Amino acid sequence: MTKVQPRALADLIKRPIITEKATVLLENNQYTFDVDRRATKPQIKAAIEELFNVKVTAVNTYHLPPKERRVGRFVGRRPRYKRAIVTLAPDSKIVLFPEV
């Protein structure tokens, strides 16, 4: 695996995904994130472990297709993006919703 600077690792993870499917996966200790399209599975694993101080057991990724958007009579496309489903060790947990 290539060495990546810690700041570059933080830039790989764009945002957590909170959808119905993602909340069902939370029960299995799996978290879903939007990631940079060029990020590899080892880089995503290193970034999650560095940012959240957890132990990652598996990383699954998939590409979502571009979405068409219409502005008046012009049709454009939103860019493609990549999602990662990260499985954590049973004793690890990421707090997405801090207690108030």
From Swiss-Prot:
Query: Per the record, GO CC terms?
Result: ribonucleoprotein complex; ribosome
| An MF annotation (GO) of this entry | structural constituent of ribosome
Instruction: Extract the InterPro entries matched here.
Output: Nucleotide-bd_a/b_plait_sf (IPR012677), Ribosomal_uL23-like (IPR013025), Ribosomal_uL23/eL15/eS24_sf (IPR012678), Ribosomal_uL23_CS (IPR001014)
| BP GO terms, sorted | translation
Keywords annotated in UniProt: Ribonucleoprotein, Ribosomal protein, RNA-binding, rRNA-binding
How it assembles, according to the record, is:
Part of the 50S ribosomal subunit. Contacts protein L29, and trigger factor when it is bound to the ribosome.
- Which purpose does this protein serve, as stated in its record? One of the early assembly proteins it binds 23S rRNA. One of the proteins that surrounds the polypeptide exit tunnel on the outside of the ribosome. Forms the main docking site for trigger factor binding to the ribosome.
Name of the featured protein: Large ribosomal subunit protein uL23
Q: Which organism is it from?
A: Thermosynechococcus vestitus (strain NIES-2133 / IAM M-273 / BP-1)
Q: What is the lineage of its organism?
A: Bacteria, Bacillati, Cyanobacteriota, Cyanophyceae, Acaryochloridales
